[in-house]
Regions:
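Bacterial Sec-dependent N-terminal signal peptides
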Residues: 1-26
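Auxiliary tRNA-acceptor-end handling modules of aminoacyl-tRNA synthetases
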Residues: 26-304, 322, 326, 337-393
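Alpha-helix N-cap/helix-initiation motif
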Residues: 305-309
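Solvent-exposed, polar/charged alpha-helical surfaces in well-ordered, non-transmembrane soluble domains
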Residues: 310-317, 321
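Conserved structured catalytic cores and adjacent interaction surfaces
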Residues: 332
């Protein structure tokens, strides 16, 4: 009996020792598998939003900092190369809005902010300004890892970037006979890819190649159209913190504008649309006319035929006459993109005059811009010019 008790106690001590070691090993394993350890094997792209990529499986992650939660970012998407029959083409500005990241338990939600309505802040009605006005929930992504200080959150964004959750990509051009409409099909997840991560202090960009599949498509221009690629660039931009002054649109004059409805107004037409305009500031505010602190710079893309470059440059600089009437001297400057430039015209940090020669272009010229939807401030612009404009083919 005594011997049995001794053996039992020895066995119990041994079991408890194993349990303690196992628990310690588990804690060590959990610690080793923390955020920092997980990121060690990933490629880091430092910028506005820190991005990490697993070069083995191609998965892409956002590292969201605590001070980036609830913060507004400008979101912009444009086509790098498309298919005219699917309503997309190079330089096509696809989408523009404001998003923010919201922590919800073990998820990070990505909200698209509704900026269509405004209130007079002195009116008591403004206290109910969120009533029945809904933001759009783009996606909700599980937090993969959290820093020990709980101020950094890692989310995988691969599926987000390779879907139409951020923006609807294709819109088929209208045709009277629906049977003649080109049907691009659906996104092929295994064929689509994140081709590039481009990160800067003020914007985080991704170049995505979407492949759409539709086995029933007939050839276009003698090309197999069952699998079609559309390349686009997503940009997440730091919200501008400056002294830009919005300007309400005068309905008697045509402007590109941000639509705003004042829900506290008694006016029968309570519209306070904000015009899209550049942020120009006089260097010498005391003078009636002054050069700007930062001029508007347009680049002539290196795809532009040599004989056209002086003509294009002079045409753009002619806008300085109008700007001078508004008080700005040399508001616009024009430069030529070098052939060996290390940046592409798809980089939103540059305003570019671009030339293309497409098989079936939808226009001769096209001049879009993207803005801060809250204020109307133009953040960038491109001018697309097609060779067909000159050849008239």
């Amino acid at each position: 009996m005594i011997l049995n008790k001794i053996l039992f106690r020895i066995a119990l001590i041994g079991f408890l020792s194993i349990s303690i070691f196992t628990e310690e090993d588990n804690k060590k394993e959990e610690k080793d598998d923390g955020l920092d350890a997980f990121l060690e094997d990933l490629t880091h792209f430092e910028g506005l939003i820190d991005v990490y990529r697993n070069d083995d499986d191609g998965k892409v992650y956002f590292l969201i900092k605590k001070d980036q939660l609830e913060k507004e970012f400008i979101y912009f998407a444009h086509i790098l190369d498309g298919i005219v029959e699917a309503g997309t083409w190079r330089g096509n500005y696809l989408d523009n809005g404001i998003i923010k990241f919201i922590k919800y338990f073990d998820q990070i939600r990505i909200d698209r902010v509704n900026t269509a309505y405004v209130f007079d802040e002195t009116n008591p009605l403004s206290k109910s300004k969120n009533a029945n006005i809904s933001n759009s929930l783009i996606d909700s992504l599980k937090i993969q890892k959290t820093s020990e200080t709980e101020d950094k959150f890692l989310i995988e964004v691969t599926s987000l970037l390779l879907s139409e959750n951020l923006s609807k990509i294709t819109v088929a051009p209208y045709k009277e006979d629906p049977k003649e409409s080109f049907k691009i099909g659906s996104i092929s997840k295994n064929k689509s890819s994140i081709n590039a991560v481009l990160n800067y202090p003020e914007n985080t960009d991704f170049e995505i190649n979407f492949v759409f599949s539709n086995a029933s498509n007939k050839p276009i221009e003698n090309q197999d159209s069952r699998n079609n690629s559309i390349s686009l660039r997503y940009s997440f931009i730091n919200y501008p913190e400056n002294n830009f002054e919005p300007r309400i649109e005068d309905q008697r004059i045509g402007f590109f504008s941000e639509r705003k409805t004042n829900l506290s107004s008694t006016d029968i037409t309570p519209y306070e649309d904000l015009i899209n305009k550049w942020h120009l500031e006089k260097k010498d505010k005391d003078n009636e006319k002054s050069v700007p602190i930062k001029p508007i710079t347009f680049w002539i893309e290196n795809t532009t035929p040599y004989e056209l470059r002086p003509i294009i440059k002079n045409a753009v600089l002619a806008w300085n006459i109008a700007f001078e009437e508004a008080g700005f001297i040399d508001a616009i400057e024009v430069k030529i993109q070098p052939d060996d430039a290390d940046w592409s015209a798809g980089d939103i940090r540059y305003n570019v005059l671009r030339w293309t020669s497409s098989p079936n272009p939808p226009f001769g010229g096209y001049g879009p811009s993207f803005t801060n939807p809250r204020t109307g401030e133009i953040l960038g612009a491109d001018i697309m010019l097609e060779w067909i404009y000159l050849t008239n083919r």
